[in-house]
């Protein structure tokens, strides 16, 4: 299981949101490049970066900071936030980013996302399908979690009909809350969507959460606030 330490960039700083709410922001570091290098020095080979400015307003993307991180580290970087075009994806991939995270377009315009997967390869595209649980059913959010696609998570994933499809799934109600991950959600995804390469995100509060996630068979897990709040060290997480 891959551990992805997370950097969320807002106004050029490293922040965490509480349950996806832009009005509930905590600034942890002023320099995302330094933070990325710190993660690398602790042994990480992977990094997850979310451009919250881009997610909120695609015209205000923080792509130059992200490209600097790719240039100045050896990290395998996956990044997204406000990705709306093939040109944006190509720009990141041409500048050292390993894979690009497609969020709203994956839910709202799946045919366009399928085209990008065909163009760049499934190993270079990660679909970020973030959900709100309504009556025990996961529905996919869109547009920086400020809207809903109205689509069921399992139906949407299976609509891609691709073995090895890379999917990052966040339970929004757990994100930044340190309340533990939604283990049942990830078990259900792996059960109902065979062949998916799943990354879990949201709620990790302790090393035991990582152990539980590993037991589900997820391919990777995003760890953010727990690291910034020093619930455990990155070295400890990488040892699991």
Curated annotation (Swiss-Prot):
One of its GO terms (biological process) is L-tryptophan biosynthetic process. Transmembrane segments: none annotated. Keywords: Amino-acid biosynthesis, Cytoplasm, Histidine biosynthesis, Isomerase. Its EC number is 5.3.1.16. GO terms for cellular component: cytoplasm. The keyword 4Fe-4S does not apply. The active site is at residues 8, 130. Belongs to the HisA/HisF family. This is 1-(5-phosphoribosyl)-5-[(5-phosphoribosylamino)methylideneamino] imidazole-4-carboxamide isomerase. The gene is hisA.
